[in-house]
Amino acid sequence: MAKERIVLPSAEFKKNSNITLKDYKSLYKESIENPNKFWAKEANRLTWFKKWTKVLNHDFKNAKVEWFKGGKLNVSYNCLDRHISTPLKNKAALIWEGDNPSESKVLTYYDVYREVNRFANVLKKYGVKKGDRVLVYLPMIPELAITILACTRIGAIHSVVFGGFSPEALQSRIDDCKPKLIVTADGGFRGGKPIELKRNVDIALEKSKEDVKTVIVVRRTGNESGLVWKDGRDYWYHFLIGDPDLSPYCKPESMDAEDPLFILYTSGSTGKPKGVLHTTGGYLLGVNLTFHYVFDIKPEDTYWCTADIGWVTGHSYLVYGPLSNGASSVMFEGVPSYPDAGRFWDVIDKYGVNIFYTAPTAIRALMREGLTHVQKRNLSSLRLLGSVGEPINPEAWEWYFKIIGKEKCPIVDTWWQTETGSIMITALPGAIPQKPGSATLPFFGVQPVLVDNDGKEINDKGEVSGNLCIKSPWPSMMRGVYGDSKRFFDTYFSQFKGYYFTGDGARRDKDGYYWITGRVDDVINVSGHRIGSAEVESALVENRSVAEAAVVGFPHDIKGQGIYAYVTVKEGIATNDTLKKELVAIVEKVIGKIARPDVIHWAPSLPKTRSGKIMRRILRKIASGEFEGLGDTSTLADPSVVQKLIEDKRKFHS
């Protein structure tokens, strides 16, 4: 194995950093040995209407966790109200850059405060109360941030659905969370192309068993030619928020620390997406504290997280983390390749971005474009880079460090999940030396362990590998799967008793650094977004020609993992490119373009045990081009199937 490179923070960065290595070690020790004391102190970063009576109450074996019992606060108050009586009132809160470079808008903290108050009153006018769900299906426009903050102001639970999801995927989320109201747009733009949103909502509601009485529509494209309007249900956002009789102030609801804040759907290893439920106090503290330390935020910084708010990264590190810290956050509607592959670098120069947080997928795609676009831009404003969504391979790390950061910007390679709410394992810039490809060390209060398949902790010195689990609760952890407490326990706490199981594998090196090795369950990480194998398989078998399908992940140069589908057709059906196109189309229709298979491998049959279980381990290896060391195949009902799949892989998919 090649010698690991260690990258130390520069003397200048260390001098001005929010934390030193010595302080990290002592604070981390306190956070593990005395979590009550540590978190009681850190909770003072937030404004509470009423102080808690108990910091932590938990029974991890039975998945019961409660933080800051009795404490009362409001998220929108912490993100807005407490800033507008300070000089932050006129500071940029959201810097919006449209899909088209000619469109941009800056909203100060007071601008956002004003809009959030008004829209909170609109929601109340249409019957939304504390505890009601509001489903949000919007493009990356300021109204998306305004809508979710307005929900938090009145105690409504928001559930944002990524605008790239299909009407069917949208319908499943409507059926599950039963929203009182939906906020959408007439459409959106992505890479210069219009995208359907209102039409998708119409289709989803037609098929849904839920009777949603109110749909509020933001005008984004202005194209009303194909817009279907249902009087008495559909209302224009700008008419409602511009109502002269609307009160300009909405008193923030006093929320219990454990009151639900939002539901965000994520893929699981079974077919049905699960609604990850986050609560108010612990979540906000987690994103507030991590944002301060991980991104080394300073009052004058302009910070840009490129994630869509439809994913957890956008919730935590575009909206709630930055705004609760009084930071200026860039919000980008577009894609890195439009109008050309220099768009990211243009935005950085346009706004003097200091901190840039993006996904390895984007970095790898931009690496492929060569240096032409980068060399035309300045990028001298950058001082810190971040990576999120999947492990970053050392080659991409080095390119990011040398070409984008000019070897002066530390990189925070952050490991966390929708379920964890906030960053769990990361370097702290200026404090923790980095190793390209390693997520490095745990954040305060996070106690990662590696366990073997029997659930025993692996405490050996030196390099070890195992299942990555968390040993004790942290404030921003999910509190449940919405409406399904059994699934919450079964998914995260049943496999290794007394531990939260992340679903990831990892290795820990001799220095205690963690290296994430990928999913160990049936979830595929495509461009940092989780796609459940079962979801894609269910979509494929909807085609009448398909008898059976098995879907696995395989290494992909750009996306990290691609989707590899083994498909068995029914007797007498011809396999051809037309059928392949039909299968790709049905996956796009049922889930969305993000889940389209990269490879469709026609399989005469699948490797199964005598009990009928598909041996996915073997399918993963074949998809990855690993034909040796397939393990024991003697338990297969027909071992010859494996050789046929290998031959076809070599012949047609090499």
Swiss-Prot record:
Where, in this chain's numbering, is ATP bound?
A: 389-391, 413-418, 504, 519, 530
- Pfam families hit by this protein: ACAS_N (PF16177), AMP-binding (PF00501), AMP-binding_C (PF13193)
Q: Give the sites modified to N6-acetyllysine.
A: 613
Q: Which InterPro entries match?
A: Ac_CoA_lig, ACAS_N, AMP-bd_C, AMP-bd_C_sf, AMP-binding_CS, AMP-dep_synth/lig_dom, ANL_N_sf
Q: What is its EC number?
A: 6.2.1.1
What does the UniProt keyword field contain?
Acetylation, ATP-binding, Ligase, Magnesium, Metal-binding, Nucleotide-binding
Would I find Nucleotide-binding among this entry's keywords?
yes
The yes or no answer to whether the keyword tRNA-binding is present is: no
Q: Which reaction does it catalyse?
A: acetate + ATP + CoA = acetyl-CoA + AMP + diphosphate
An annotated GO cellular component = cytosol
Which SUPFAM superfamilies does the UniProt entry name for this protein?
Answer: Acetyl-CoA synthetase-like (SSF56801)
Q: Which residues bind Mg(2+)?
A: 541, 546
Family the UniProt entry places it in: Belongs to the ATP-dependent AMP-binding enzyme family.
Described function: Catalyzes the conversion of acetate into acetyl-CoA (AcCoA), an essential intermediate at the junction of anabolic and catabolic pathways. AcsA undergoes a two-step reaction. In the first half reaction, AcsA combines acetate with ATP to form acetyl-adenylate (AcAMP) intermediate. In the second half reaction, it can then transfer the acetyl group from AcAMP to the sulfhydryl group of CoA, forming the product AcCoA.
- In its UniProt entry, what is this protein called? Acetyl-coenzyme A synthetase
Q: Source species, please? A: Leptospira borgpetersenii serovar Hardjo-bovis (strain JB197)
Q: Which gene encodes it?
A: acsA
